[in-house]
Every structure is written in structure tokens, then in C-alpha cells.
């Protein structure tokens, strides 16, 4: 008899609802996953950042944008109520994104943050999924939180194994 390790899941952001499409409850989704066909497959269960559970009924691509129909969302008004919501899926925590430049929130939260010159800044407290880009909320001991856009130019190094990331902030960014 073999013992298999118990699967532990974590919540990962897979998309953000942009707006209603049409009058029958479809919504546009800004995809934030490396595998949209699997994450948004019919029957997939997702939760929103407000805790609402949604089941994917069907999807289709339209003009380069993913359109999703959720069970029980049958009209434009109900669909519009979902506008701006971040969608999360449960993922086995042992699975990493295929793209080595992509990270799940749980991999970043709790990481030590330092500048490229070695100055300690703090710890990643949260990943904010804003309409334009993701932003790292960095908890600092004395100066309150710092907010750094999670883009390669400002975050040139992420070391998941060492639980550390390095930032290259322009002058004044950490003082905002």
C-alpha cells in the first residue's frame, strides 16, 4: 500500500470580469491564467473576490476576448453586477504556472522584498489585481505599506525557492 501526499489547494486569480456582453448574461473576462481552456471549462467552479460562487456554463472567444456565461446569470443587469470582480480557482499548491515568469499570489505573499542594491524593504502582504496591472502591497515596519506595480522593469528578480524578490524602484516610488 502506498501513501500519496494529501492534495492541498490554494486560491489563485484566473481572471477579472470586465463588463456584460449582450442581454443574456454573458460577461467579458480579462484572463489572468496560463490555461484559460481548463480554468474556464464548462462546469468549472470559480469564486469572486467577494465570495460569490459561480459555475461556468459555457465560454467563447469574441474579438480576442473571452466571453463567459455563468449558471444563474441570465440577464444583463445581473451580469453587470459582477463587473470588476476578480475570479479565483482552486489549484493544487504543488503545481506551478507553465511560464517561468508567472506566479500565483500565494507564491508571492510573504516574500521578503529588497532593492537591487540589497536594501531591505519589507514583506509582500497582498497582490492587488487592478484593471491595468497587478500591484504588490509591501508591508514595511515603519513607513506603512508601499505599492509597487508587478512589472519586470520594477521587479526584475523573483526567487520562489529563496522566498525573496528584488525591486528596482524609481526615485520617490516607495515614498508614495
From Swiss-Prot:
GO terms for molecular function: ribosome binding. Gene3D superfamilies: PRC-barrel domain, RimM. InterPro entries: PRC_barrel-like_sf (IPR011033), PRC_RimM (IPR056792), RimM (IPR011961), RimM_N (IPR002676), RimM_N_sf (IPR036976), Transl_B-barrel_sf (IPR009000). Signal peptide: none annotated. Keywords: Chaperone, Cytoplasm, Ribosome biogenesis, rRNA processing. One of its GO terms (biological process) is rRNA processing. The keyword rRNA processing applies. The keyword DNA damage does not apply. Residues 100-173 form the PRC barrel domain. It comes from the Bacteria. Its main location: cytoplasm. It is found in: Cytoplasm. GO terms for cellular component: cytoplasm; ribosome. An accessory protein needed during the final step in the assembly of 30S ribosomal subunit, possibly for assembly of the head region. Essential for efficient processing of 16S rRNA. May be needed both before and after RbfA during the maturation of 16S rRNA. It has affinity for free ribosomal 30S subunits but not for 70S ribosomes. Binds ribosomal protein uS19. The PRC barrel domain binds ribosomal protein uS19. Belongs to the RimM family. NCBIfam families: 16S_RimM (TIGR02273). This is Ribosome maturation factor RimM. It comes from Acidothermus cellulolyticus (strain ATCC 43068 / DSM 8971 / 11B). The lineage of its organism: Bacteria, Bacillati, Actinomycetota, Actinomycetes, Acidothermales.
Amino acid at each position: 500500500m502506498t501513501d500519496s501526499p494529501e492534495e492541498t489547494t490554494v486560491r489563485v486569480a484566473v481572471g477579472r470580469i470586465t463588463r456584460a456582453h449582450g442581454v443574456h448574461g454573458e460577461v467579458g473576462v480579462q484572463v489572468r491564467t496560463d490555461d484559460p481552456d481548463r480554468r474556464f471549462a464548462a462546469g468549472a467552479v470559480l469564486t469572486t473576490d467577494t465570495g460569490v460562487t459561480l459555475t461556468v456554463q459555457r465560454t467563447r472567444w469574441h474579438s480576442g476576448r473571452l466571453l463567459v456565461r455563468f449558471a444563474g446569470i441570465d440577464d444583463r443587469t445581473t451580469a453587470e453586477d459582477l463587473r470588476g470582480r476578480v475570479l479565483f480557482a482552486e489549484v493544487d499548491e504543488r503545481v506551478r504556472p507553465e511560464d517561468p515568469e508567472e506566479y500565483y499570489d500565494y507564491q508571492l505573499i510573504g516574500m521578503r522584498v529588497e532593492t537591487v542594491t540589497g536594501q531591505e524593504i519589507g514583506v509582500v502582504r497582498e497582490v492587488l489585481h487592478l484593471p491595468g496591472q497587478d500591484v504588490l502591497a509591501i508591508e514595511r515596519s515603519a513607513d506603512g505599506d508601499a505599492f509597487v506595480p508587478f512589472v519586470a522593469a520594477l521587479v526584475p528578480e523573483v526567487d520562489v525557492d529563496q522566498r525573496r524578490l528584488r525591486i528596482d524602484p524609481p526615485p520617490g516610488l516607495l515614498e508614495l
